[in-house]
Amino acid sequence: MKLIWLGHGGFRLETGETTLLIDPWLTGNPMLEDSQHDAATQGATHILLTHAHFDHVADVLELAKHLSVPIVGQYDLMGYWGETEGVQTVGFNKGGTVTVGDTRVSMVPASHSNTFSTRDGLRTAGSEVGYMIRAEGKTLYVSGDTDIMADMDWMGDYYKPEIGILSAGGHFTMDMKAAAYAAQRYFAFKTVIPCHYRTFPLLEQSAQDLIDGLPGVNVIEPQIMKDIEL
């Protein structure tokens, strides 16, 4: 299983014949060069969304049409886009599990907000969520944008993810210290990968507090468009 950071909260996850684009933000992403867009998206089979804020979905509709791939995400938003945008969607909700290519994806809670812009102004897009992704005998937790929450207790106990992708840049999500606390208290990760940081000056620029707070855990600071073998 191979993971590639696209900057901010975006990732490319490759497993078997399946390539998931998770919250891919390309246009306007200061961390990703325009010349890297094709490599970031080529061969994708599905798009997986945690919520509808612009820095997670700005390119999603165009990508889904260009690549002819389904968008997988929260039921309310998928239903709306399926009706209004003519894209393939797979909508489900918290507690649900769907087969996405070679993976099994379970939707879990997050603690954030979830709106998107339309010609008529802001519109709510159902709940913000995270995912537990099972592939190649491993379980990977994608937190999405979130703060620490009590739900992490049962999520860690029930799904037992070995790998955590945690939004940890602060201001809009938990920061590195909070992410370390959540990981240590609620999960038994072997590997943690921070994201949603370094993008803007108001976000944290280093994962050192996460590293310091998780002795014995393999904390990987991702680099743009560089492979991480999981």
UniProtKB/Swiss-Prot annotation:
Alphabetized UniProt keyword annotations: Hydrolase
HAMAP family the UniProt entry points to: UPF0173
Organism from which the protein derives: Ruegeria sp. (strain TM1040) (Silicibacter sp.)
Family: Belongs to the UPF0173 family.
InterPro entries noted in UniProt: Metallo-B-lactamas (IPR001279), RibonucZ/Hydroxyglut_hydro (IPR036866), UPF0173 (IPR022877), UPF0173_UPF0282_UlaG_hydrolase (IPR050114)
Protein name, UniProt field: UPF0173 metal-dependent hydrolase TM1040_1920
Pfam families recorded: Lactamase_B_2
Coiled coil residues, start to end: none
An annotated Gene Ontology molecular function: hydrolase activity
Protein's UniProt keywords contain Hydrolase: yes
